Amino acid sequence: MTSRVSHTSVDSRNAYTQSLFWAEVLGYSENPEDPNEPGHEECLLYSPDHQHRILFIEVPEDKAVKNRLHFDLRPTDLSQADEVARLLGLGASVHADLRRDDGGWVTMLDPEGNEFCVLCSELEVGDPLAFPAD
């Protein structure tokens, strides 16, 4: 017997603004029959295939320490550099640039200071997590 992940929860000072940012980053959407709105204490996003959900939950305290869990993003149709530029335009900031000639990543912060990483794109390295062909 096993379990499956129902959704990923993210503590937030403002669940609504975080849901707007991450919807733009990931191409996720809200439930049109139960849209996220300012003042909602919980805001839910769905992946395009509805296989993953992210729940932003308002909490009273600010983020105080480094995340123990974070998203590693692999751009699908832009280079790593172009994706970093796009995310900067959405309100993210660069925390650490760890790019190397053979790959590396950029650690960024979302508008509330949560870390996430931007890896090399699929265009640059293929899909390293793909299952090997039989």
PLM segments and residue spans:
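Hydrophobic ligand-binding cavity/cleft-lining segments
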Residues: R13-A23
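Vicinal oxygen chelate
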Residues: T2-S3, V5-R13, E24, P32-E33, L44-L45, E61-R86, G104-L109, ...
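Short alpha-helical
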Residues: T17, Q51, L78
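Nucleotide-cofactor and metal-assisted catalytic machinery
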Residues: G39-H40
